[in-house]
Amino acid sequence: MAGSGQERARHWRYPELPGVDLLRARFVEKIFVRHTHENFVIAAISDGVEVFHHGGADQYAGPGALALVNPDTPHTGRAGVPEGWRYGAVYPSPELVAEIAAETTTIRGTPGFVSPVLDDPYAAGLVHEVLRAAEEGNALAADTLLRVAVTRLLRLNGGPLPQRGVHT
């Protein structure tokens, strides 16, 4: 990977994609301690390998794969190779994913991802295209590509999430 050793991240919001955070990053030594996100994580790996602890086991995502984390799901993150990993990610809100699922899939209930890693270079490319469209200010392309990507991921690797009880 070119420029090995340099860590960088750009996190932003594109006003024309409400409810979605965007990220481009490259990490070598960064270690993410156990944490959660309110939104979904859809991270497309470009180079290197990301290892993340999820569901009681280490998961490995390399080039062309996606790391997929449902909201409020504890996970970690670190490099799986000395060169680190480079990725682009979208963080759509649960409400947006539910809207897309209702319009484009047969999933009933709260939609989510079944497996935390999916090897799908086409879907990974769609995530990178969403980021590119947002950077270029192309709202129609960014929204369309995001919806196509989420639809594809839900059709290939989606299902209803288990109901969570209310704790008092």
State where each predicted segment sits.
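Amphipathic alpha-helical segments enriched in hydrophobic/aromatic residues interleaved with Lys/Arg
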Residues: E103-G165
